[in-house]
């Protein structure tokens, strides 16, 4: 079945096919259609929708539902995402699967409702307290708003971790055709750890507190070991990169601009290609290094350089110090979007 829907609506459809039981949320532009869609479709399919009194309540309601073994989700935008950071840390600390969708808008402060990718650091590195991070995916189309929401639930369940679907206001509002899955994901069995009120789960304990420092350190190391194993699930894609002299690195909506930029440059005789991380955490370092080795690298992003810094860091960690040092950034902020003309002009300066 194919539907012509907004990216935000595609998120709700993906959540339903992933088997999401409960949606807790508070509407905020430009993510409000996710709450609207959940309010409409969840009850129709026997699922639960709760409009919370605020974003802080939403994420803590998710903690309770996840602790009871229910698949749950919330969605928000910049200011609301900030309010959820403590709760996401608690989810990570208790190793609870849950999905948070952030439709990034311009900031800081109230900002405006136009697109940015400026929430990169809290979405990817963990914006709350402690040594944690989420499994973070970055869709680039309405189709992927559905598909990667499903993946986020699968990875949250697999790794017992909060997962973030990181998109922006442009992706949330644009409309495209979305092919829906043929069937719903099977319900996972959480009885080995969840507190479900049954005899077999009565001794399960969900917590994130370790009063003994040695035990707290041991648990922290357990999390870091888990995050290292998560790297096996890193995803990326390349486009026209095999013979490229310049590699354009971008994710989300910026990756679509990057593809058109590469095509435009090639039409003018400049061999350009693209690398797109699909997961931002874990970051596909090895794949990036393979694509970037010996090439000029340019980043397109809607931020002040947070993503470009991560590209440099991952290239340097992969032993490509020269490529890392040469990374150039073309960006816009405040709700402005990089144009293909901007990117083509910047690329010509790099080569």
Residue ranges and their predicted role:
Residues 1-126, 133, 141, 339-348:
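Thiamine diphosphate
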Residues 4-10, 223-246, 259:
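Glycine-/acidic-rich phosphate or pyrophosphate-binding loops and their flanking alpha/beta elements
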Residues 39-44, 222, 260-274, 317-318:
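Short helix-loop-beta junction
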Residues 115-168:
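Conserved thiamine diphosphate
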Residues 160-238:
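Conformationally flexible catalytic loops at phosphate/diphosphate-handling active centers
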Residues 235-271, 275, 281-288:
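Redox- and metal-dependent alpha/beta enzyme cores, enriched for Fe-S-associated oxidoreductases
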Residues 302-351:
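Peripheral docking tails and interdomain loops at the edges
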């Amino acid at each position: 079945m194919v539907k012509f829907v907004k990216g935000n609506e595609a998120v709700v459809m993906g959540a339903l096919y992933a088997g999401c039981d409960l949606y807790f949320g508070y509407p905020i532009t430009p993510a409000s259609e996710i709450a609207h869609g959940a309010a409409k479709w969840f009850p129709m399919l026997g699922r639960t929708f709760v409009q919370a009194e605020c974003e802080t309540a939403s994420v803590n309601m998710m903690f309770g539902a996840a602790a009871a073994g229910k698949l749950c989700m919330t969605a928000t935008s910049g200011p609301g995402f900030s309010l959820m950071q403590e709760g996401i840390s608690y989810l990570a600390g208790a190793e609870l699967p849950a999905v948070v969708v952030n439709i990034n808008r311009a900031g800081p402060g109230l900002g405006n409702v136009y697109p940015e990718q400026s929430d990169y650091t809290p979405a990817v590195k963990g914006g709350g307290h402690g040594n944690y991070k989420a499994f973070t995916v970055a869709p680039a189309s309405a189709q992927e708003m559905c598909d990667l929401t499903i993946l986020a639930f699968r990875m949250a369940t697999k790794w017992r971790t909060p997962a973030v679907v990181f998109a922006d206001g442009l992706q949330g509002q644009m409309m495209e055709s979305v092919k829906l899955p043929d069937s719903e994901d099977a319900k996972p069995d959480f009885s080995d750890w969840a507190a479900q009120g049954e005899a077999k789960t009565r001794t399960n304990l969900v917590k994130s507190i370790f009063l003994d420092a040695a035990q707290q350190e041991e648990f922290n190391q357990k999390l870091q070991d888990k995050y290292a194993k998560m790297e096996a699930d890193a995803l990326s894609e390349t486009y026209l990169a095999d013979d490229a002299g310049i590699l354009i690195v971008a994710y989300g909506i910026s990756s679509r601009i990057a593809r058109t930029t590469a095509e435009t440059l090639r039409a003018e005789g400049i061999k350009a290609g693209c690398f797109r991380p699909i997961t931002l955490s874990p970051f596909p370092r090895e794949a990036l290094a393979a694509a970037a080795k010996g090439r000029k690298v340019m980043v397109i992003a809607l931020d002040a350089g947070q993503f470009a810094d991560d590209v440099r860091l991952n290239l340097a960690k992969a032993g490509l110090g020269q490529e890392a040092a040469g990374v150039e950034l073309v960006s816009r902020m405040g709700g402005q979007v990089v144009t293909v003309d901007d990117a083509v002009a910047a690329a010509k300066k790099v080569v």
